[in-house]
Amino acid sequence: MQQLNPSEISEIIKQRIAGLEFSTEAQNEGTVVSVTDGIIRIHGLAEVMYGEMIEFEGGVYGMALNLERDSVGAVILGDYRGVAEGQKCKCTGRILEVPVGPELLGRVVDALGNPIDGKGPINTSQTDAVEKIAPGVIWRKSVDQPVQIGLKAIDAMVPIGRGQRELIIGDRQIGKTAIAVDAIINQKGSGIKCIYVAIGQKASSIASVVRKLEEHGAMDHTIVIAATASDPAAMQFLAPFAGCTMGEYFRDRGQDALIIYDDLTKQAWAYRQISLLLRRPPGREAYPGDVFYLHSRLLERASRVSEEYVEKFTNGEVKGQTGSLTALPIIETQAGDVSAFVPTNVISITDGQIFLESSMFNAGVRPSMNAGISVSRVGGAAQTKVIKKLSGGIRTALAQYRELAAFSQFASDLDEATKSQLEHGQRVTELMKQKQFAPLSVAQMALVLYAANEGHLKDIEVNKVLDFEAALLSFAKAEYADTIAHIDATGDWNGELEGKFKELITKLKASRTW
């Protein structure tokens, strides 16, 4: 019988212990107490962070929104029908992140960055947090570079700059989305990346917008984020934040981006629904107390950041370049009531508003912008030199026209000066009309504004003004292509260019009768 040496036994045990694979992992687990309308109450989930991702059985995720003494209230991100009472769930230790990067351009994704356009997976290499702190005061720069929308009324009277927040507000079905889509189409070739966030809209409406962008070759520089009316309230609430994170990717690397939130009213409705289901105390119009903070923390992230910020963020890879994220939030009003809770909140947060009126839309003035109460708080600082020089008289003419038009209804005989002002105002109002998907370049806009300012429309019938404009632009393209190209490239305005414009209009008028 073989004798075992005690030292050998101890050696074998040591080897076994050394080769033993064991790992302990502490998991923070809880139990689902109730599931109602996409809201899940969880018991026993200690040390969970606000906004942390929670993993349920079946690979479904939720987000912690209410942290109470003995329970956690979470919203489910996806289909909650597989989650049942008594199931286990665990913390992930991660805040919600979405994919970011240029790979997303040309694609349609949901609020979590998952592709929904049937074009296969998106191979992004980076993700970023949905909730981020806006850049501080010290990292910001003043807004002084233009974002050309391509619409005469907006670029002339309410100029938008890179890094600005300009609200588009009005009733339903009066062209709010049309302005936003035109803005995206006009960025083709400008280097500005666009993000269109559709919140709570019909899937057919979103498909129509995507189709229009594809038709005009604008999808190559655009990301579309869709949280449709059939998506859970949590997705509609998160979509704008996800879009903002995708836009910040470009801003932080010294590029320019434009984001459109269509519309923030539906995001506020979704947030109200979530808050009421979480049993948070309701306030005015049943909105929770922090609905202002919901929109302010989102819109403050749109900014123009300094060269130092970009250099620091990119670790010195990008130098001497500013970055910007321009926001065009849309708010839907009920019967023109801008004094409701959400409209007043967003008006106070943004740097100006484009107010669209139903009466003007129904009268055929499209875009139906009311020039009297629409304003850009950045103003001329963000306009190109030529547009700034030529647009001054347009707002004045429209303001005087509105005042005199109201007065002339009661007065029977008007003096010649008043009649002249009224007629000029009528022509300018007609000139500000513009078809959808037909944005103008800087030079084309300058030519049209010059014709209005210098009284070249006086002898044109009001109903022929738009025909004259079309002929003018066509003639300029054929005969004065160099002048148009020069203004488009430089934005300059001087006596020589003014002479060319005058000569152009005179030649056109001499060539045919109006």
Swiss-Prot record:
Subcellular location as annotated: Cell inner membrane
Any GO CC annotation of this UniProt entry: plasma membrane
Cystine crosslinks: none
Site (Required for activity): S374
Keyword Iron: no
Top EC class for this record: translocase
Pfam family, any one: ATP-synt_ab_N
Binding site for ATP: G170, D171, R172, Q173, I174, G175, K176, T177
SUPFAM superfamilies: C-terminal domain of alpha and beta subunits of F1 ATP synthase, N-terminal domain of alpha and beta subunits of F1 ATP synthase, P-loop containing nucleoside triphosphate hydrolases
EC number annotated for this UniProt entry: 7.1.2.2
Superkingdom to which the source organism belongs: Bacteria
Membrane topology: Peripheral membrane protein
InterPro entries assigned to the protein according to its UniProt record, in alphabetical order: ATP_synth_asu-like_sf (IPR023366), ATP_synth_asu_C (IPR000793), ATP_synth_asu_C_sf (IPR038376), ATP_synth_F1_a_nt-bd_dom (IPR033732), ATP_synth_F1_asu (IPR005294), ATPase_F1/V1/A1_a/bsu_N (IPR004100), ATPase_F1/V1/A1_a/bsu_N_sf (IPR036121), ATPase_F1/V1/A1_a/bsu_nucl-bd (IPR000194)
GO-annotated molecular function: ADP binding; ATP binding; proton-transporting ATP synthase activity, rotational mechanism
Tagged with keyword Hydrolase: no
Catalytic reaction equation(s): ATP + H2O + 4 H(+)(in) = ADP + phosphate + 5 H(+)(out)
Family in the record: Belongs to the ATPase alpha/beta chains family.
Function: Produces ATP from ADP in the presence of a proton gradient across the membrane. The alpha chain is a regulatory subunit.
Official protein name in the record: ATP synthase subunit alpha
Organism: Cellvibrio japonicus (strain Ueda107)
